[in-house]
Amino acid sequence: ILGSGDIGLIMARRMTLEGAHVKVVAELMPYSGGLKRNIVQCLNDYDIPLKLSHTVVDIHGKERVTGITLAKVDEKGKPIPGTEEEYACDTLLLSCGLIPENELSRELGVKLNPVTSGPVVDESLETNVPGVFACGNVLHVHDLVDFVSEEADRAGTCAARYILQENQSSNPGIDQESQYSDSDIGKASKMNDNNDPVIPLISTGCVRYTVPSAIHLSKMPDKLKVRFRVGKVVKNCAVDVYCNEENSEKRIKTKKRPVVAPGEMEEILLGREELLKYPDLQQLIITVKEG
């Protein structure tokens, strides 16, 4: 199996349970892209080896696969000559990442994040196209369905309120009960509303992206959960949020973490009141630092 994300790890276990002999899981990166518990439950528990910093450099066979050649890669991901290993096998599974399906979004003119390949959204999960909201794996790839359900509830609530606002309707039937109250969500916002400045969230260091990508302070809930992923494993670190620049005097919030890894989504909770303490706020910088 090439690829050690959660799908690759789970497929290693499933193939084993179905009677196949999984010889090895190879991963191009120097770390697994899956949850730690999946490495333990899907590989370690079944004595399936995981080779990090390895990739497939050759596939053997004509009518069907008869074997593959693995090689170690350097820090740039290029195969290192002389490190080749041959494995006799009849199947090669490729689990090399997920890309959100966003053809419809492109047709609508929705702006996409080049890192996630998903829409750029604000605190209401609304895109740059008014009335178009995004959540779940079409927005960014999730670890757990619980997070998808939470986002879906929030996006649905905001979309319903947007419709009510647009129709100037007071029909309460469309606004179903939700864990997000009126005070939490506020009115559905538009990222292109010139009367309400947009505060962008800037990812620096090993932080690859954030969801949301921007917020409107006037429409932000009392507490806003910002989710993000990192690009490498960092131990004994802190997630820092800054106002405008990375300066200790401008640090809004910090959150200690024993370790962060690309395979596990991180989050930090931002309070509206703590942001309002910075009247000169023009952008929020989110970074992860060791120590």
Where does each model-flagged region fall?
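A Rossmann-like FAD-binding core segment of flavoenzymes
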Residues: 9, 14-103, 222-258
